[in-house]
Amino acid sequence: RVRSDLLEKSEKEGVKVLLQDRGPHGEFAWKVLSEVLCYAASLLPDVTSNPADIDDAMKLGYNWIKGPFELLDNIGHEYFIERLTEEGRLVPAFLLINLENNFYNASVEGLQVLQETGIYAPITRSNDVLRLSELKQTLKAENSNAVASWYEYKESAVVEFHSKANALDSGSLDILSDAVYEAEKRGLRGVVVHNDSQHFSCGVSLWSVRECFEINDYQKLDDFLKHFQNTMLQMRDSSLPVVSVPVGMSIGGGFEVVLHTDQVIANTNSVMGLVESSVGLIPAGGGCKEVLYRWNEKLGDSRQAAWNAFMNIGLGKLANSPLEAEKLAFTRPTDSFHVNRDHMLGIALSSLSEVTKIPQREPLRLTGKTHFEEMKLWLSKNLEKGLLTPHDQTVGIEVARIVT
């Protein structure tokens, strides 16, 4: 992948930064994207009179994060038209309508979109469709930072991660903790952890962990892990129901968030698992404990539960669907999964009144030293066979120590 300050800045501030650059990267991006956006605009009103229809088609059909007209709002109509004119290119007629305003407008009535008549009209969705990406444009965040935000909606707290790949750091945990605290304080119905991104969360930001090693600040790392664990316990022990709505990848620390919620409402396109062993680490946000509890609940056999947890965590097993997640004890019978992600936020909000808080659990009965030695022997044999690396063995020994 090409890395540059320009591309890093574009990811943070939007595509307009890239397109306004007159270097080779910017010129290439402009040449390609301007053609696509002009073509999209030329389809109105022949294909549809509503720009939102084209944006939806590109997002749902081609997995775009933003549609053409949402991108044009980010780029700026005036800049886009001026540059087309400067290059002697044809400006689609629809772009010349109501030049002073964006295609999308957030009002007290809800999100509106510009029509070919030059007048805004409400975006209408079926009753079951609720998108946070649209909803939040009409709401004010109760608390927000660069990586996460939370909103109050329908007497509920809705938490959104919005960092790159929704990687978690201290800022993410601050918002999550504040949402749970404020929801209890205000007497809200509960907390929903959700976002409209491609992935729920790809785990803890390894860059922030790496930084601790590079500057030899191990206390900072300890403080972060303590903050992570305490936030997970705060969610689990809250008097209010906490529901997670995973889509795409929920792995590593992102899956630890899911594990500590009272109910999981997953998309059929969900990938879950504790994958830290794949990068030579151990899950440190409480995930090991939760997986061990889940296997005990599922099997009622402490030795087999410990062995299954050892294999799950040590091998970094992934569930590539909710059905696989159930087999790996990643989800409970009370959890559910749904095909249409546009319905999931509404389902989660409705479920808050029906969710049963996970009761206080008895301490786990651990299997002890003999079982630990059996796991160490398994690791040694597989190291000799060349199936594990020496560091795999090191990680595996620590996982075995935890689950026994």
Locations of regions flagged by a protein language model:
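N-terminal glycine-rich phosphate-binding loop for ADP-containing cofactors
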Residues: 1-191, 195-198, 207-227, 233-239, ...
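Short alpha-helical segment that forms part of, or immediately flanks, the ligand-binding pocket
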Residues: 256
